[in-house]
């Protein structure tokens, strides 16, 4: 049975959850930091020990988060005005003896300074079903944190799943559309939107087919990006195409669905094939007329890739079935020359100008969300495009970003420490870092926004006894990279 929340049932359930403080803050406050963290690791016993009272919040935590069977009277009191029978008819609960247990995962979700949301998805016990619909997982959170949040007229959540990205889009887009090929995903997304009183258009179909002929200001997608043999074991992760072919086709088609200046962002995986550089592979997918920023965040060898996704699907890699599947998957990788699999974020922006295409390998961990960095990167690309001429760049006034630090390092020498290098780097965002020589470090130190870049270079040429023209030629490419990475900020 597909879940369905009528408007009246959604309103009643929302009232009950709000009254009980079954929210991200309410649950975290009840459980405490240690039990809440343990629950996130899949260790429920600390939460069971804390949420042991008869209060509505305790009952809902045990029922909806911990998988307990709760007595009819306790469930009725916690969910009122929604009755347990109505909740069961909606697909939320199932009778178990004299009590009730959850039939779906219903958990609170929210963002800083945002509304309290709830997300409906499948329970982990259903994970090995082909049409399993995942909840708020690591991939969903990664994409949400990387998405640009500027106000737009229209947004498309391509492959909406349980609706997480569409929920976020509802805060900054006037119209939100979600698509999915799986009826169960669409049903759960519809229930999520009804429960949160969010208006999202849902359309059924594969990839971009349901929105043929339409353009959007923003497209976000957490598509089935796991490269492997051509098969569909799980709709949420397997494309049915060989390797990364489906993703390549999707990326190539995105420009035709973007309005002028529209931005598409998606999580993606690409194969590292023997004898081929991964940027060349992904570059071949990119549509004409789009700026592109491709950020590789992880690289997995074949064994790690296969084992990770077997465990994600609930399959023990050491079981006979797990070994058979791994053998077939690894043999496919051997035949196709796959040496590794990259994972990251791909951002496209439709433009009428000559496109800027940049590939970055950023595997070092950082905590800051990537969304503000993507927004800043797009702005900086516009600025650099407007200052593409050397004369325009030299006339600009630039300021060193406040988070930038200069590092110098030395090595032991015959008479003590000997300077061997220096680097500048931001201490926020992705921690961009560039090695610099003496003149470059001095130039950055002089960037306070008071003088045009050209005058600073002239002063630098005098100080270092170098021809100005030669210093301009050597310096401007680095300056452009400093601007692109946000180390230098245009003034005024």
What is each of the regions a protein language model found here?
Residues 1-59, 98, 126, 353-445, ...:
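Acidic, low-complexity/disordered tracts enriched in E/D and polar residues
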Residues 56-104, 161, 175, 348, ...:
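Long, charge-rich, low-complexity alpha-helical segments
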Residues 94-155, 162-168:
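SAM-dependent Rossmann-like transferase core, predominantly class I methyltransferases
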Residues 115, 197-200, 290:
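A short helix-to-beta-strand connector/capping loop
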Residues 137-221, 227:
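Conserved SAM/SAH cofactor-binding pocket of Class I
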Residues 182, 243-296:
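Conserved Class I SAM-dependent methyltransferase catalytic core
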Residues 183-184, 221-249:
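Mobile active-site "lid"/loop adjacent to the S-adenosyl-L-methionine
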Residues 302-378:
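Flexible, glycine-/basic-rich loop-and-beta segments that form/coincide
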